[in-house]
């Protein structure tokens, strides 16, 4: 579903319906796979002051009709720990008050 890049040029992809996030290199080779407690992962991004926190969002409602006890991470933000990567600044916006 959603995706982002890290500072080394890897692409991180949220895998809707697969309950995981993949880290791919420039050739498309999977370098890491992180399994999550949510089936429908929606997006992934780097956060924090130095963009070293990897945050994943998941959907609470889906057409798949998963039982809540089978998808206890649904509708939550999940932080992936131990990934040893950092993000790159994308776009910044100034929102007027």
Describe these PLM feature segments.
Residues 1-29:
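Loop/turn-rich, solvent-exposed surfaces of beta-rich toroidal or solenoidal domains
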Residues 58-74:
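Short, conserved, GDST-rich strand-edge loop motifs in beta-rich repeat architectures
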Residues 11-16, 53-62:
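Conserved beta-strand positions in repeat-built beta-propeller and related beta-rich domains
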Residues 72-85:
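Beta-propeller blade signature
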Residues 1-10, 38-53, 74:
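Beta-rich, blade/repeat-based domains predominating
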